[in-house]
Amino acid sequence: MTATVENLTFQKDTLGNAVDKNTSRLELRSYSLAGRHGSTEPLVLAWSSQFRRLTWGCALDALHRSPCVAASQHGVTHLIRSSRTPHSTRCRKEDAQPGHHGNGAASVTAQARGQRSVLQVPLPVPRSCLFSESFVVSVSSQSRFLASVPGTGVQRSTAADMAASTAAGKQRIPKVAKVKNKAPAEVQITAEQLLREAKERELELLPPPPQQKITDEEELNDYKLRKRKTFEDNIRKNRTVISNWIKYAQWEESLKEIQRARSIYERALDVDYRNITLWLKYAEMEMKNRQVNHARNIWDRAITTLPRVNQFWYKYTYMEEMLGNVAGARQVFERWMEWQPEEQAWHSYINFELRYKEVDRARTIYERFVLVHPDVKNWIKYARFEEKHAYFAHARKVYERAVEFFGDEHMDEHLYVAFAKFEENQKEFERVRVIYKYALDRISKQDAQELFKNYTIFEKKFGDRRGIEDIIVSKRRFQYEEEVKANPHNYDAWFDYLRLVESDAEAEAVREVYERAIANVPPIQEKRHWKRYIYLWINYALYEELEAKDPERTRQVYQASLELIPHKKFTFAKMWILYAQFEIRQKNLSLARRALGTSIGKCPKNKLFKVYIELELQLREFDRCRKLYEKFLEFGPENCTSWIKFAELETILGDIDRARAIYELAISQPRLDMPEVLWKSYIDFEIEQEETERTRNLYRRLLQRTQHVKVWISFAQFELSSGKEGSLTKCRQIYEEANKTMRNCEEKEERLMLLESWRSFEEEFGTASDKERVDKLMPEKVKKRRKVQTDDGSDAGWEEYFDYIFPEDAANQPNLKLLAMAKLWKKQQQEKEDAEHHPDEDVDESES
């Protein structure tokens, strides 16, 4: 009985090179061990990533105790039990020797006796753990088990032993080990690593087929037949893949089979006649093989079928020109131009004519070109073409036609810049200025940047100072135009624009800008929106009066502005006053009075009354002044200034009683804006009239209304300044009365102010006893703390402040007495401490 293990086929590389060493997974595959007589036994193969080796074993009865294979460094070791060492194993002639590897396969025949020993055969390991290559293990045995072999010491075994051992082997099939550590490996495999290793080994690259040498015509025909069959099969699989057709035709062309290649191209055109590459390859084949007429026919068919493909036209005209057929090329160009192609096609036609010195034909083409593509750049190219060939008059006409063609609606600065540069080259500087100014007057500023730049450069080169200033003014004018167009209610921009125009332009141009500016009336009738706008009218009127010297137009401007202002909601006293002053300068006093009277009637304002009264005072019309003051006080009885001015007017006129009556009316008003000023003016008036009793009565009446410290001081100083007998006594009495009155006053600073004024009086006019008396009334300054609270009532800390404690108030407050006693006790304690320190000092002195 012999057991043979043979035909083990694997890939060349070892499995360990393709499997991640960190993978903890265990994959098992079971294969059948096929015997030569049809018997099968399971062959178990297992890949262990832990050892990076393939382990496999046979489930035969003789191997069930050690079914697995031990790991070796180079591959897998096949264990077969034997009674002797591996050196006692004999291999059959057709089998490979142990440890031998031959072209990716190993065939081993192992014969062993019944006694246990190990036969180790290193086998190559497949690259993939799933074994892309199959293998067969054949066992030759009549009794389906190992038999004894003479000279080997292997004992025979019976079939029953084999069956028992087989059953035991089937029960002991290795199980998949459970993975206990499921944590990820420290080093992870990446796709980059897999791709790099695959590229290094180049497993997917197949070796090139061997070169075939053709030695006779029969082999050549056979080769052609096979290639044509291959091409036809490819075409039959997918007819729409044009590359297959082109390869087929090029292969036929390489064999000089032009007719066949032409037939293939025609078949391909039937499939997809819109394919540009197909037409190009077809025509190129004909041209390479010098089939000119065929090429012409193909190009004709191509441009007829696909007239918008410029590449066909370019190659067709180029072929005709290379063949020297200039007329034919021109005819092709003409056919092309009928389709009105893109600009480059026209330029190609023009350059073609210029290569043959056909300037007139090129000019004709340009005439057609600028009509088909009417762009500014094309007109400029046409003009430069004429200039290049020294047709300057024609070039000027082209520019003029272009300016007329585009008109004012589609003006482009590049056209005028090119036109001006052309005239500059011709030394026509006046023409250049006219062109620039014409363009600047009609093109918006944002579209004329290049125009301004070139105009400035031109003036710097050929102009004078005035010309440069004109450019700057023009540039600023366009800037302001853009600003006011963007925002018509931007009155600051209008002011700047008008200032610029007034300094340079004529009167009509200035008036036009003013009319445009004042036409932008504020949309909201609120005075804050009209404040800047009304100055446009004022500047307009002043310009007409001072610059244009047109009084009648100035009057019209004033009247128009006054009619525009909504006087029921608000008015502008400045406008009325300026109008009245203008009429006075024109010696129209009646119109001035009428204007001021109208303003007072429509919207009485203090400023209007004051100006009108001042005017009448200058004219010495006092009756009119009285009437105006009366009217003024009817509209504003709370205005103390008006009352004072009215009384002063009567005082100047010598009507004292009338002035006193005006003051009495004034102080009797229930509401006044500045009553203290009015009372002071009334008192000063009585003092000037030397009415002491009236003045004293006024002070008493004023003190009934207010107990302000300044009133008391002023009253005392009045009594002192009267100069009569007993004035000092009356003054002192007033101070004493004021002091008594202000004891209950919360404002201690005012009371202190009164005492300081009283002390100054006593120092100047009083005796020593009077001074001492006032000094005793002076308060003591004390620093205190108080809690500070915010607006929401929360505490904000403490603050220090100075308070004044008056002796008169301290006598009535027991807590102040307690504070005084505490200060006295503290003083006594300090004196006592000082006395205790003096004896020590005496002892020190005696010792020294």
UniProtKB/Swiss-Prot annotation:
Sequence segments annotated as region (Disordered): 81-106, 827-848
Phosphoserine, modified sites: 503
InterPro entries per record: HAT, HAT_Syf1_CNRKL1_C, Syf1-like, TPR-like_helical_dom_sf
Expression tissues: Widely expressed. Highly expressed in testis. Not detected in brain and lung.
Subcellular location(s) per record: Nucleus; Nucleus speckle
UniProt keyword annotations, A-Z: Acetylation, mRNA processing, mRNA splicing, Nucleus, Phosphoprotein, Repeat, Spliceosome
GO CC, one annotated term: post-mRNA release spliceosomal complex
Basic and acidic residues composition-biased segments: 828-840
Subunit-level organization: Identified in the spliceosome C complex. Present in a spliceosome complex assembled in vitro containing CRNKL1, HPRP8BP and SNRPB2. Component of the minor spliceosome, which splices U12-type introns. Isoform 2 seems to be predominant in the spliceosome complex. Interacts with PPIL2 (via the PPIase cyclophilin-type domain); they may form a trimeric complex with HSP90.
Known function: Involved in pre-mRNA splicing process. As a component of the minor spliceosome, involved in the splicing of U12-type introns in pre-mRNAs.
The protein's name in its UniProt record: Crooked neck-like protein 1
Source species taxonomy: Eukaryota, Metazoa, Chordata, Craniata, Vertebrata
Gene: CRNKL1
